[in-house]
Amino acid sequence: VKLLNKIVVITGAARGLGLETARKLKRQGATVIGIDRLEPHTALNFDAYYLLDLCDRERLDEAAASILERFGDIDILVNNAGVLTLERGETGVNDDVRRAFEVNLLAPWQLTSRFLPALLRKRGKVVNVSSLFALVNAPYVAAYATSKRAMSAYSDVLRMQYPGQLDVVTVFPGFIDTAIHDPAERVGLSVKRLVSFKRGERVLLSLEEKLDDASNGLVRACTQQGLRNRGLTFLGSVAMYTARWLPSLVDAFISLRLRRLSKAGQLSLKPELID
């Protein structure tokens, strides 16, 4: 699919993966409409930009109506926005948990429903950004992992419901060094250290996905046909399929990795700082 003159709506467009992907979509000639609760981190000439909180259902509906009125039918919707929260086992369904489900699942669901007639008319595409945490089990990320796994299920239902009319792709980013991981870093759960394998100060292997590579992968998800589930990078795809087909092995590996990092003093998890 060529992007020239395609109309693309992308959420979470102010920072990180969303902003870098929007920049590359623009570079390939797409009309790019951003949605985020923050102003863009760096200058980018969006064709339209809607400053709103995805938890505000009324404003989200108004933005969708405004986009359709101004641009007509859209070609691609990228549900990229996400929020990572951390919970202990005894944490109830608090405001942070509700916000995680709203941003990661319910807002994309709502936005997709508002754009669906337009997308069907254009035989368009929905790209839902899930996470490897939807497949790789880790402690303290119950709301994030559950909502992202539900996002994958929502994609599968849409794909089955509109065969030949709507292309639905789910992507599973691994660790990308962006601000979404700040809450985990603050309580000592460093995903960056978890995915970096060192001998002394020398990095032998890193499973980190560089922002440039990951955004290239998200652009490919917007343009390539016949995709269903994919990682954003080669290593990401390997991790995705390994987690899907060998879950017990991956669980054992993550548990061992957490124990070794803690024993070496490289991981200082502070559960008492988690609400």
Residue ranges and their predicted role:
Residues N80-T85:
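Conserved NAD(P)H cofactor-binding loop of Rossmann-fold oxidoreductase domains
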Residues R88-R98:
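Substrate-binding pocket helix/loop in short-chain dehydrogenase/reductase
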Residues A14-R15:
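Conserved glycine-rich cofactor-binding loop
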Residues L52-E62, N94:
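The beta1-alpha1 cofactor-binding region of Rossmann-like NAD(H)/NADP(H)-dependent oxidoreductases
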Residues T112, S147:
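Active-site helix of classical SDR
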Residues S131:
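Residue(s) in the substrate-gating loop at a strand-loop-helix junction
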Residues M160-F234:
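SDR active-site lid
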